[in-house]
Amino acid sequence: MASKRKSTTPCMVRTSQVLEQDMLEEADRAKDKGAGMPQSDVTKDSWAAEPEHSSKETEVVEVKSMGENLSKKLQGGYECKYCPYSTQNLNEFTEHVDMQHPNVILNPLYVCAECNFTTKKYDSLSDHNSKFHPGETNFKLKLIKRNNQTVLEQSIEATNHVVPITASGPGSSDNDPGVSVGKTPMTKTGKLKADAKKVPKKPDEAAPENHMEGTARLVTDTAEILARLGSVELLQDSLGHVMPSVQLPPNINLVPKVPVPLNTTKYNSALDTNATMINSFNKFPYPTQAELSWLTAASKHPEEHIRIWFATQRLKHGISWSPEEVEEARKKMFNGTIQSVPPTITVLPAQLTPTKVSQPILQTALPCQILGQPSLVLTQVTSGSTTVSCSPITLAVAGVTNHGQKRPLVTPQAAPEPKRPHIAQVPEPPPKVANTPLTPASDRKKTKLQIAHLKASFLQSQFPDDAEVYRLIEVTGLARSEIKKWFSDHRYRCQRGIVHITSESLAKDQMAITGTRHGRTYHVYPDFAPQKFKEKSQGQLKTLEDSFLKSSFPTQAEVERLRVETKLSRREIDSWFSERRKLRDSMEQAVLDSMGSGKKGSDAVAPNGALSRLDQLSGAQLAGSLPSPSSAIVQNQEQVHLLRSTFARTQWPTPQEYDQLAAKTGLVRTEIVRWFKENRCLLKTGTLSWLEQYQRHHMSDDRGRDAVSRKVAKQVAESPKNGSEAAHQYAKDPKALSEEDSEKLVPRMKVGGDPTKDCLAGKPSEATSDRSEGSRDGQGSEENEESGIVDFVEVTVGEEDAISEKWGSWSRRVAEGTVERADSDSDSTPAEAGQA
């Protein structure tokens, strides 16, 4: 059905030139007809089988408009044929046409490359083709721009599939030379382009040609279908679609035509040249409400005019379907596909009488794009009293399995006296594996390897720069928009706490990818007994330990590096890392048990996996390199201890305290904020068992220091000035605090409104968490001394015992002051923590 639609966009020429050329051409045609040489060039740029009176109406309007232009001819102005715009300036007129009518070509020049024939009128080119190129249908037009002049160069492509079509009627004799087809659709950048100008005829001249005109128009349209199908390329997805079977009776001149009321007030003839409307009608003649709304916005015409235009076009082309047929055709068009096979187009012109006569077969094996439904039928409607025995011309699509086979599959002919348009049966294609339809790039699922690369980049920076994006494009093969969208989604999810991307989870993903690639699955904690391998040397163990300190889950590249350096197999390396992780976890559990945990495993595992993710963080996230595996375990445990100690002191840390915790623990700030949020929720439900243990631990330390506090309280109360000096001295150097200064310091804390209190309260408040756990091996205390951080959690054992006893009495009071300050700010701090 697509072949029946043509754009009637004429070429824009100057008004004076239009009149001169029309008058000359009309005189030439009158001379030819007077000499008794009827012209067969009746292929105008209107759709096939248009009613005769509709063309006359168009001619009358054309003549009237030309008469109106006589006054403008003297002025030398330019008038637009598509809108009332007119101007005296050629540049303004050209700009108007380019902006408002982009499909219009101004003053084209037609050139026939075969004969070196040149003309400015498409009708003259059609006459030239009918005289000098009879029977040629495979014309090719090439658009060329030369010095602000548009040149359409016509050439003929060599083909072996062109067969001349002859049509015979009751009034034609045996020696009729046949009707040659010389008109092809004009193309401009893939769109149909033709000149819709019609030469006005007198009624008495047009009447004798009615019979010949109807026959010629029928055969011309059939040939144009083949010509257009032959010039279209195949779809890229190699899916064959079903084209409507076009049924046109050969005795169309004897069939009464259906009158179409084009002169109604609601019918808008401007829609006949609208490419959007024509394309929509070509796709499906029954538009939905959504399509009507879209066409209303696209064409800027009322919806009622569009409805009437569609109804008129269906009436003109004999399309009348029931609602069930419309629904079925729409389902077949948009939901069903037929396997890709080389299509064979067969045209079977039937005889005019019921007698069986051998019929010529026109077969073309042209690769083409075939669109539409198998139930679409185009035919002339016959009256009830007329009983004409005819089988219409059927354009069918036959599926062929063998690529070398070109024999047409003959469609069964229709029965005589058809009451309704017949549907050509399309042979069912052989069973074949269905082609997977292509999905958009945004709908494709990403592989595990692509996600692993994205997560690794996300850990480094949540806002990647252009260089990182280009690197990800090369590594993952994803589009830039997909990568940007993935980062945006995961930033949102991390802020809401939906997903948490850590180096530990990334390592597990890479291990799973490696296991899938090698045909086996890696288990973090395998249940089976490990296989015994040969003893490893000291150098191999040192290399493995160094790699374990960086990450307990080595990446694929790290495993390959270890294989080269240690000369061990992949299984040996994986087994060693698995055993090493089990040893680390058991030692962590032993440390928790030694601290007095009442319930086994309650400290190591928290609901929702909040604590387990922090306990299993790899050493790669820690600040600095660690000297030994035991230090890594202590440092991991130290992170948990710092967080719990801070939580026991204040449940709502300030943003500055969050930053300090992130610097001390080496954890991501979002992980720390999430940890506090989850533990506050657990505290409300009463399932936070370790909090009581930490609070008891603080209370026991404070009771041991109460004796020293009571002893020095009386002495320091007598000398408040010395207490102030001691406070300032401690602020400068905490290690230089003597016994006498500590005795003067604690009572001074009780005096309100003194700068000494602010000085002492400000100094410990900077240390919102501590590194007391690191002091168990004699290293954490040195770090605390160098950084000036006060330990509020544990009493240090060893060299620092004397100092701890000296200033332990006032540490309790300072800690209480910090807790009170944190509680007072608890109303405003949650919002800040949520934003962090």
Swiss-Prot record:
- Positions of C2H2-type zinc fingers: 78-101, 110-133
Q: Which UniProt keywords apply?
A: Differentiation, DNA-binding, Homeobox, Isopeptide bond, Metal-binding, Neurogenesis, Nucleus, Phosphoprotein, Repeat, Repressor, Transcription, Transcription regulation, Ubl conjugation, Zinc, Zinc-finger
Q: Do the record's keywords include Transcription?
A: yes
| Superkingdom to which the source organism belongs | Eukaryota
In this chain, the stretch annotated as Required for interaction with NFYA covers 263-497
Q: In what ranges is there compositional bias, type Basic and acidic residues?
A: 50-61, 192-214, 699-709, 730-746, 813-824
Query: Region (Required for nuclear localization) spans which residues?
Result: 317-446
At which residues is Phosphoserine found?
A: 824, 826
Region (Required for homodimerization) residue ranges read 195-358
Residue segments, region Interaction with EFNB1: 27-77
Q: InterPro entries, from UniProt? A: HD, Homeodomain-like_sf, ZHX_Znf_C2H2, Znf_C2H2_sf, Znf_C2H2_type
Covalent link (Glycyl lysine isopeptide (Lys-Gly) (interchain with G-Cter in SUMO2)) residue numbers: 64, 455
Q: Where is this region: Required for repressor activity?
A: 263-446
In which residue ranges is the amino acid composition biased (Polar residues)?
Answer: 8-19
- Free-text tissue specificity from the UniProt record: Expressed in retina where it localizes to Muller glial cells of the inner nuclear layer (at protein level). Detected in heart, brain, spleen, lung, liver, skeletal muscle, kidney and testis.
One of the protein's GO biological processes: retinal bipolar neuron differentiation
A single GO molecular-function term is: protein heterodimerization activity
What subcellular compartments does it reside in?
A: Nucleus
Q: Which residue stretches belong to region Disordered? A: 1-61, 164-214, 404-442, 699-836
Q: Which residues bind DNA?
A: 263-324, 439-501, 530-591, 628-690
Q: Which Pfam families match?
A: Homeodomain, zf_C2H2_ZHX
Which protein family is it in? Belongs to the ZHX family.
Q: What is its biological role?
A: Acts as a transcriptional repressor. Represses the promoter activity of the CDC25C gene stimulated by NFYA. May play a role in retinal development where it regulates the composition of bipolar cell populations, by promoting differentiation of bipolar OFF-type cells. In the brain, may promote maintenance and suppress differentiation of neural progenitor cells in the developing cortex.
Q: How does it assemble?
A: Homodimer (via homeobox domain 1). Heterodimer with ZHX1 (via homeobox domain 1). Heterodimer with ZHX3 (via homeobox domain 1). Heterodimerization with ZHX1 is not necessary for repressor activity. Interacts (via homeobox domain) with NFYA (via N-terminus). Interacts with EFNB1 intracellular domain peptide; the interaction enhances ZHX2 transcriptional repression activity.
Q: What is this protein called?
A: Zinc fingers and homeoboxes protein 2
| Gene name of this polypeptide | Zhx2
